[in-house]
């Protein structure tokens, strides 16, 4: 159980206007507009996020997809999480349908697509590669390594990384991966060795940018000292605030690292389309293992959804759109990656870029949320064992 009430010594934060998934399951958990600016390459070191206004927020609103930077990688302000198309939120989608959704996202201005070797496993990378091949040079692909899919467990040994990247490149039908994340920090391999292996792959042109998923602030600093980290991917949403409390967001801001929230609509819960009667098949849906998705927690957390619904009515929007707009309003270097296999849900998600939350809106949302309690852990105990705690 997580309480959201502020520390008595800390005043409520005012959000200024942003004028935006055993072992395989553990591995898989990571994570409307038209033209966007061209993608930027380069891996130069940077210190501090400088693409910001004095209060670290940027203008938001309108129907045109804007561009944000993850380190030196320029991407659309909303990305596309491709895991759920192939695995982990029910049976895999029809391949034709999955490709159509990915391509529709690109047509609507999305240039950032997220996958991983473990999703499926392998089938997500294959689907993404096929879907994006016709316009590969107009998009950025993020994928992930870090699990031993034959022996089981974590494996970030440099020689393993340099082997699996070749397989991912083939499945993705490309000669380079724009952003390559360590999926989970391997306690048996120094992060400096991991960063060094990625540095070698960057020199070879096979990887363009380095990322970490579910890493602690300490690990981020150690990795960044060897090879610039472009992005951190961690669960973060209106109801899941760990990155605000554990120093990860602050470290990203200090070091000029972008942040990519996975599960930005609470694995579907914040859409308001599931209630205490929702059930999840343990054979195909990771949420069946999570206490936050038990009938008891689903009912207990409903006030959070009601809060978003009330706000959505005022803004002529949906709860999902408010949740995404809230994330986009936090920092100009945050890029949420909502995922869906449903075309209507895709359009709904992308509609979030037209929702403008004022300073008063953000303060009201924060004040109301601070009176609520989030029930149930974000993942099961066995999944949390693979999350880096920085010790």
Q: Where is each model-derived feature located?
A:
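N-terminal twin-arginine translocation
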Residues: 16-22, 33-51, 59
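N-terminal amphipathic alpha-helix/helix-capping segment at the start of soluble metabolic enzymes
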Residues: 57-79
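Structural preference for beta-strand elements that scaffold enzyme active sites
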Residues: 75-79, 112, 138-142, 176-179, ...
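N-terminal secretory signal peptides
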Residues: 1-18
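Beta/alpha (TIM)-barrel catalytic core signal, keyed to glycine-rich beta->alpha loops juxtaposed to Asp/Glu
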Residues: 189-372, 386-391
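Glycine-rich, proline-tolerant flexible connector loops at the mouths of alpha/beta enzymes
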Residues: 115-130
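N-terminal small/glycine-rich loop or linker at the start of catalytic domains
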Residues: 71-89, 142-152
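Short, acidic/polar
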Residues: 92-104, 157-170
């Amino acid at each position: 159980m997580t309480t959201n009430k502020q520390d008595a010594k800390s005043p409520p934060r005012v959000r200024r206007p942003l004028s935006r998934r055993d072992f395989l399951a553990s591995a898989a958990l990571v994570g409307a507009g038209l033209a966007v600016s061209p993608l930027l390459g380069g891996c130069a070191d940077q210190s501090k996020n400088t693409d910001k206004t004095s209060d670290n927020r940027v203008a938001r609103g309108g129907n045109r997809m804007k561009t944000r930077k993850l380190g030196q990688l320029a991407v659309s302000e909303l990305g596309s999480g491709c895991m759920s198309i192939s695995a982990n939120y029910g049976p895999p989608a029809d391949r034709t349908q999955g490709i159509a959704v990915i391509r529709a996202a690109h047509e609507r201005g999305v240039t950032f697509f997220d996958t991983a070797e473990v999703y499926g496993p392998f089938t997500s990378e294959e689907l993404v590669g096929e879907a994006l091949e016709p316009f590969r040079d107009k998009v950025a692909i993020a994928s992930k390594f870090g699990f031993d899919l034959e022996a089981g467990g974590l494996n970030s040994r440099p020689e393993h990384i340099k082997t699996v990247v070749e397989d991912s490149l083939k499945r993705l039908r490309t000669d380079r991966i724009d952003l390559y994340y360590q999926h989970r920090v391997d306690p048996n391999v120094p992060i400096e060795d991991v960063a060094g292996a990625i540095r070698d792959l960057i020199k070879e042109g096979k990887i363009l940018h380095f990322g970490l998923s579910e890493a602690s602030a300490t690990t981020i600093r150690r990795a960044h000292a060897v090879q610039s980290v472009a992005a951190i991917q961690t669960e973060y949403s209106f109801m899941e605030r760990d990155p605000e409390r554990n120093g990860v967001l602050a470290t990203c801001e200090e070091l000029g690292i972008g942040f990519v929230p996975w599960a930005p609509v609470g694995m579907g819960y914040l859409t308001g389309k599931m209630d205490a009667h929702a059930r999840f098949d343990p054979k195909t849906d990771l949420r069946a293992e999570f206490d936050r998705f038990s009938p008891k927690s689903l009912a207990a957390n409903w006030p959070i959804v009601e809060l978003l619904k009330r706000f959505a009515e005022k803004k002529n929007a949906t709860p999902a759109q408010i949740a995404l707009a809230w994330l986009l309003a936090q920092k100009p270097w945050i890029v949420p990656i909502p995922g869906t296999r449903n075309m209507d849900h895709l359009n709904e998600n992308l509609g979030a870029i037209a929702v403008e939350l004022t300073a008063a809106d953000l303060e009201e949302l924060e004040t109301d949320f601070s009176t609520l309690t989030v029930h149930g852990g974000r993942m099961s105990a066995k999944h949390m064992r693979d999350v880096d705690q920085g010790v």
